[in-house]
UniProtKB/Swiss-Prot annotation:
Belongs to the universal ribosomal protein uL22 family. GO terms for biological process: translation. This is Large ribosomal subunit protein uL22. The gene is rplV. GO terms for molecular function: rRNA binding; structural constituent of ribosome. This protein binds specifically to 23S rRNA; its binding is stimulated by other ribosomal proteins, e.g. L4, L17, and L20. It is important during the early stages of 50S assembly. It makes multiple contacts with different domains of the 23S rRNA in the assembled 50S subunit and ribosome. It comes from Rickettsia rickettsii (strain Sheila Smith). PROSITE patterns: RIBOSOMAL_L22. Signal peptide: none annotated.
Length: 119
């Protein structure tokens, strides 16, 4: 059996209380960015969801360092994928006895970091 040299680590955050469209704005922003630069950008981002993305990214970095022994300074975010999760359906009373439906969207976030060679 041939064993591959694994040089990437992943982390995931599931059932985040934000729509996938809003989460994808932040995920697309950090995609293909160096981890150190992405952490600075997420720290000072005005988006509410940036804190959750930062926590997930720090988890991926910790997985890379502790489980695989990768060098933190050479890590790059290769994948930042967003997926839809459940939708909570709620009812809001309106005028004249009517009611409308409110959808509360949840999302999943998957981050993969890879160690890149210095050129």
């Amino acid at each position: 059996m041939v064993q591959e040299n694994k040089n990437f680590a992943t982390a995931q955050a599931k059932s985040i209380r934000v729509s996938s469209r809003k989460l994808n704005l932040v995920a697309a922003f950090i995609r293909n960015m160096k981890v150190s630069e992405a952490l600075v950008q997420l720290t000072f981002s005005p988006k509410r969801i940036a804190k959750v993305v930062k926590d997930c990214l720090q988890s991926a970095v910790a997985n890379a360092e502790n489980n695989l022994g990768l060098d933190i300074d050479r890590l790059v975010i290769t994948k930042a994928t967003v997926g839809k999760a459940l939708v909570m359906k709620r009812v809001m009373p309106r005028a004249k006895g009517r009611a409308t439906r409110i959808n509360k969207f949840f999302s999943n976030l998957y981050i993969t970091v890879t160690e890149k060679e210095d050129n």
